[in-house]
Amino acid sequence: MIQQESRLRVADNTGAREILCIRVLGGSGRRYAGIGDIIVGTVKDALPGAGVKRGDVVKAVVVRTKKERRRPDGSYIRFDENAAVLIRDGGDPRGTRIFGPVGRELRDKRFMKIISLAPEVL
């Protein structure tokens, strides 16, 4: 469960290391984001000479959350960290590589490019 002021690790090679959530997209009163939801964030930590700089406002899709999520078959999935992948306005990832596993919920939300780049889908 990601909300405003949550910090997330960036799981791609855009050069950003950490982002701060400033808005959860999808409705005026929407409070929380889970795996597969889109957020607006600002870059808090970035590598020097990268494509994104500290302070840039970016869109990202959440790929891992510490809060467990119940699946339709009754199982639960949770990860060790909160992580996101930076995306363009069309929904395509800005980076060319994804690090770490991603949730299967991304397939339901039609983020096929992220699914294909990810080393593991849980």
Curated annotation (Swiss-Prot):
Q: Which domain of life is it from?
A: Bacteria
GO biological process terms held by the UniProt record: translation
Q: Name one GO cellular component term.
A: cytosolic large ribosomal subunit
Q: Does the keyword GTP-binding apply?
A: no
Pfam families registered for this protein in UniProt: Ribosomal_L14
Q: State the UniProt keywords alphabetically.
A: Ribonucleoprotein, Ribosomal protein, RNA-binding, rRNA-binding
Sorted alphabetically, which Gene3D superfamilies does this protein's record hold? Ribosomal protein L14 (2.40.150.20)
- MF GO annotations: large ribosomal subunit rRNA binding; structural constituent of ribosome
Translocase as a keyword?
Answer: no
Job description of the protein? Binds to 23S rRNA. Forms part of two intersubunit bridges in the 70S ribosome.
> Which family does the UniProt entry place this protein in?
Belongs to the universal ribosomal protein uL14 family.
PANTHER family according to UniProt: 50S/60S RIBOSOMAL PROTEIN L14/L23 (PTHR11761), LARGE RIBOSOMAL SUBUNIT PROTEIN UL14M (PTHR11761:SF3)
**Subunit structure as annotated in this protein's UniProt entry:** Part of the 50S ribosomal subunit. Forms a cluster with proteins L3 and L19. In the 70S ribosome, L14 and L19 interact and together make contacts with the 16S rRNA in bridges B5 and B8.
NCBIfam families the record matches: rplN_bact
Q: Which HAMAP family match?
A: Ribosomal_uL14 (MF_01367)
Q: What is this protein called?
A: Large ribosomal subunit protein uL14
